[in-house]
UniProtKB/Swiss-Prot annotation:
It comes from Human cytomegalovirus (strain Merlin) (HHV-5). The gene is UL52. PROSITE patterns: HERPESVIRUS_UL32. Disulfide bonds: none annotated. It is found in: Host cytoplasm; Host nucleus. One of its GO terms (cellular component) is viral envelope. Residues 19-35 have a biased composition (Low complexity). This is Packaging protein UL32 homolog. Zn(2+) 1 binds at residues 200, 203, 276, 282.
């Protein structure tokens, strides 16, 4: 049974937006719309307690144990070496940092350990086991061949004593081979959800849950989460919120399901959520040719995998053009479900919830917050992460003892396949070191941390778009003030510098030295000067209403002039987030008397449409991959071909940015 198969509903097949077959999110079997309504009406008690509106700080709190555990799973890890190998590797890096064996040490974000993904054993979904044996042998072989060949090249190209020393340092060569092989093995396990023939684990879990969801209440709330996901920026904070709320929905409706074990035993990883909610968007109605859609997904997965593995080349395949299949309309123009959105806005109000504390907690003590101390928050987070690592080591030791006992009595009790295939252990977490200084980088759409020219692969302004309705309004006001600052032909960088200075002066209550941990001030979004908490009136026209608060100004200081310039005018990833984000929907809190009505409308219409097609997001991800990948001759040829198509794509999507050829090597 394929869990991602969309089954036609038995309800009405002509929604308000035109005649087409109505589909529900990936289910098996799919409940009819009439059964959903009947079950809802027959369960007044369940309806009264269901007040889930999505994207709320009630379900994702920075100090909760679940949040810390999710962040722990999203951190990179490094396999430790013994002292002798570590000393040899350090000496090799000092002598020849460009050696292929040392390039992977430079990419600290790559070395991590995560277990395999096996929904089958834990949930008894089906007998088929998810494996990646072929991928494993290929990756390890390539890693060994690259290092070996690289050593020969390095030895022949380096002239003088330094080159001779690097070529003859056998201990360093062995250290590089052992570390790279171990890291690649753990990266292979992490990338299991990104394989071509691996099913979506979330779809498998959803199919099981729907069989137990007798009154369809869980389906309605899951549909609301998917609806809000379509209007959320693709940022690390968005991924964390989705993971947390999805987990809470499972815990709330299926108490017998040990959701903690899904992450602890690596049945689910962060890339399962990337795949389901952002890359493949399994809940979205299929538009166009099924094979073309599959190719878009597989290409996107290959690019993400290449960034995680730190490969030298970007898996870019120039799209084939079929003249006979030309479309008269712009294929990149998306019709949004305006009637459904209007209905949602009519029965909702912008929430004052703000995820700034969670944002600071995520990136405290990392390179993303390099100029922001956050000492107390950093100390708290690191202590919690260390506690989780210690608990994981104890769990590993317990599981190993149980496996040894099972082996001793092997023929008498038989083998338990769940323990020997990696599904019951932590997959080597106890043998790896958490890279706390990098942060939960695998929550990001670009799962690699780089810095270049005062920018990084984590855009704080994109993260801020997922924080609150208020932050989106102030960001839009900031953009308006920059582009309309004066009538003279002043460069954008100068405009940003001047506007930023004005904004910092306008900040009503600047932070003093006593507020070193600025996150304490971001519990709720500020109200208007009159005390009104209704943000429908906030607009960029009234500067008093859209005035930034101290927390917002602090984030602007951290981003800097260059980061603001990159976000608004240079980066296609940021431009895509600006295009798709609808803060009124994302942070809309449904009125209590219309919660069930709106959820039913969303589930029935099944319009989970993003304002940018998945192919556009694929090209944006390719652009980001080219930015962080080392330039080789083959890579330069691919980049030239890609840039010609990419600039045309931006024009077709009506996205106006600084020419990408100017910024492809300038920022990350």
């Amino acid at each position: 049974m394929n869990p991602s198969t969309h089954v036609s509903s038995n309800g009405p097949t002509t929604p308000p937006h035109g005649p087409h077959t109505t589909f529900l999110p990936p289910t098996s079997p799919a409940p009819s719309t009439s059964s959903v309504a009947a079950a809802t009406l027959c369960s007044p008690q369940r309806q009264a307690v269901s007040r889930y509106s999505g994207w709320s700080t009630e379900y994702t709190q920075w100090h909760s144990d679940l949040t810390t555990e999710l962040l722990w799973h999203a951190h990179p890890r490094q396999v430790p070496m013994d002292e002798a190998l570590a000393a040899a590797a350090a000496a090799s890096y000092q002598v020849n940092p460009q050696h292929p064996a040392n390039r992977y040490r430079h990419y600290e974000f790559q070395t991590l350990s995560l277990g395999t993904s096996e929904v089958d054993e834990l949930l008894n979904c089906c007998a088929e086991e998810t494996t990646c044996g072929g991928t494993q042998s290929t990756v390890l072989t390539n890693a060994t061949n690259t290092t070996s060949c690289g050593g020969a090249v390095a030895g022949s190209s380096n002239a003088g004593p330094a080159g001779a020393s690097a070529a003859c340092d056998l201990d360093a060569e062995l250290a590089g081979l052992e570390t790279s092989a171990a890291d690649f093995e753990q990266l292979r396990r992490l990338c299991a959800p990104l394989a071509i023939d691996t099913r979506c684990n979330l779809c498998a879990i959803i199919s099981i849950c729907l069989k137990q969801d007798c009154d369809q209440s869980w389906l309605l709330e899951y549909s609301l989460l998917c609806f809000k996901c379509s209007y959320a920026p693709r940022a690390a904070l968005s991924t964390l919120i989705i993971m947390s709320e999805f987990t809470h929905l499972l815990q709330q409706h299926f108490s017998d399901l040990r959701i903690d074990d899904l992450f602890r035993h690596h049945v689910l990883t962060v890339f399962d959520f990337h795949l389901h909610f952002f890359i493949n968007r399994c809940f979205e109605k299929q538009v166009g040719d099924a094979v073309d859609n599959e190719n878009v997904t597989l290409n996107h997965l290959a690019v993400v995998r290449a960034m995680v593995m730190g490969e030298d080349t970007v898996p870019y395949n120039k799209p084939r053009r079929h003249p006979q299949q030309k479309q008269k309309n712009n294929p990149y123009h998306v019709e949004v479900p305006q009637e459904l959105i209007d209905n949602f806005l009519e029965h909702s109000s912008p929430s004052r919830d703000r995820f700034v504390q969670l944002l600071f907690y995520m990136w405290a003590g990392t390179g993303v917050m390099s100029t922001t101390p956050l000492t107390e928050l950093t100390h708290t987070k690191f202590a919690r992460l260390d506690a989780l690592s210690t608990a994981s080591e104890r769990e590993d030791a317990r599981m190993m003892m149980e496996e040894e006992e099972d082996e001793e009595g092997g023929e008498k009790g038989g083998d338990d396949p769940g323990r020997h295939n990696g599904g019951g252990t932590s997959g080597g977490f106890s043998e790896s070191t958490l890279k706390k200084n990098v942060g939960p980088i695998y929550l990001c759409p670009v799962p690699a941390f780089f810095t270049k020219n005062q920018t990084s692969t984590v855009c704080l302004l994109c993260e801020l778009m997922a924080c609150s309705y208020y932050d989106n309004v102030v960001l839009r006001e900031l953009y308006r003030r920059v582009v309309s600052y004066c009538q003279n032909n002043v460069k954008m960088v100068d405009r940003i510098q001047l506007v930023l200075a004005d904004l910092l002066r306008e900040c009503t209550s600047p932070l003093g030295a006593a507020h070193e941990d600025v996150a304490r001030c971001g519990l709720e979004a500020p109200t208007s000067p009159g005390g009104d908490s209704d943000y429908h009136g906030l607009s960029g026209v009234d500067g008093a209403l859209a005035r930034p608060d101290p927390v917002f100004c602090h984030v602007l200081r951290q981003a800097g002039v260059t980061g603001i310039y990159k976000h608004f005018f240079c980066d296609p990833q940021c431009a895509g987030n600006i295009r798709v984000t609808n803060e009124a929907v994302l942070f809309g809190h449904l009125h209590p008397h219309h919660v069930q009505e709106v959820k039913l409308a969303i589930c029935h219409d099944n319009y989970y449409i993003s304002r940018l097609p998945r192919r556009v997001w694929l090209c944006i991800t390719l652009f980001k991959a080219f930015q962080i990948t080392k330039r080789t001759y083959k890579g330069k040829v691919h980049l030239a071909d890609f840039m010609r198509d990419f600039t045309q794509l931006l024009e077709n999507c009506d996205i106006k940015l600084v020419d990408p050829t100017y910024v492809i090597d300038k920022y990350v």
